[in-house]
Every structure is written in C-alpha cells, then in structure tokens.
A protein has these predicted regions:
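GHKL-family ATPase ATP-binding module
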Residues: 1-99, 132-134, 141
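A short acidic, often aromatic-flanked loop/helix-cap motif at beta-alpha or helix-coil junctions
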Residues: 101-103
C-alpha cells in the first residue's frame, strides 16, 4: 500500500508539471481510437455492400448505373406509391422507418448499429470512412422523398446531414436531391 500511495502522489505531480506530455498521450490515444473506429466502419461497410437489402426496390439496369436514381422515402406508404409510378429500369426506392438518427450527435459505432443507415449505405454502395466514387455506386442520383410537413422537413434535414457529414463529394457532384412533394389539404 505504501508503494501504491507513493506512485499515485508522484505520478500526479509529474503529470501536472508535464501537461504537454499528458495532452500528447491523450491526443494520440484519441487518434488511435478514431482510426480503429473508421477501420472497423470500413470493414463493416464493405461487408454491408455485399448484403441484400430486403426493403430495397432495386432498379433493373445493371450496366449503366450512372442513369439510376434511388428514392429514399418516408415510410412504407410512400414506397407503395413509388412502386407503381416508377420507371423500373432506372428507378429504385427504399422506405425509412421513422426519423433517422442525428449523426451530428452520434459516434460511428452508433451509426453503424443503425439499421436504416446500414440499409441506405448497402443500397447505394457507400462505406463510412471512404469517399464516394459515383462510378462505383449502384445509384448515381439520390432523392429524398418525404411529406411536405414538419416531420418531412426534419427527415430531409437529417438525411442531408448524414450524407454531407460522410460524403460531401456527392453534393459537389449534384447527386443528392430533395423532391418537393405536393401539399394536399
């Protein structure tokens, strides 16, 4: 117990005197942790790319994927309307269950555990921690299709936040769009 108390007392003094070293060690530990999380995310993302997404209405075009559009819809009722109105050759769709999570307040582990985001990434061919190459994606256009109400606006904002946080190059390329649904009274 004497050695333990001596070490604790002197280690505390040393750490207070040498704050630069302490901060450096903490920064490196955080950096290693973030790198490991991105590495795990990349591995899980590559695995997810090979998965079949149950709720995906896929486009039938296989060769010219640059012509394909994915509609991310608010709920099963919206996807039902899309199912009958879409051009099956070039248009696909996936329905969200409720509001997606806010990635600004989440860590990578939570995002990867979120089934909605995992399905979206697998449907498009995106991987967290890797830039999006339009030529490699299953859909080169992504359209958010939500109701014209407060919830729909919030869903569009959360989806925009998700894509812009991890793949801002999709916005630069003009691949992300928001459909303005008509308002019925």
């Amino acid at each position: 117990k004497g050695i333990e108390s001596f070490m604790a007392k002197n280690a505390d003094k040393w750490l207070r005197k040498n704050k630069g070293y302490t901060e450096l060690v903490l920064e490196r530990a955080k950096s290693r942790h973030k790198f490991q999380m991105l590495k795990d995310a990349s591995k899980k993302g590559r695995k997810a790319k090979r998965q079949r997404v149950e709720k995906l209405l896929d486009a039938n075009e296989r060769r010219r994927r640059e012509l394909c559009t994915l509609f991310i819809c608010e709920g099963d009722s919206a996807i039902g309307g899309l199912r009958s109105a879409r051009n099956k050759l070039y248009q696909g769709g996936i329905a969200l269950k409720g509001k997606p999570m806010n990635v600004a307040q989440s860590n990578i582990k939570d995002i990867l555990a979120n089934q909605e985001f995992t399905n979206i990434m697998a449907s498009i061919g995106l991987t967290l921690g890797q830039p999006a190459e339009l030529s490699d994606l299953r859909f080169s256009n992504i359209v958010f299709l939500a109701d014209s109400d407060v919830d729909g606006g919030h869903i569009n904002t959360l989806l925009t936040n998700f894509f812009f946080t991890f793949w801002p190059e999709l916005f630069v390329a003009g691949a992300i769009q928001i459909a303005k649904a008509p308002l019925y009274e």
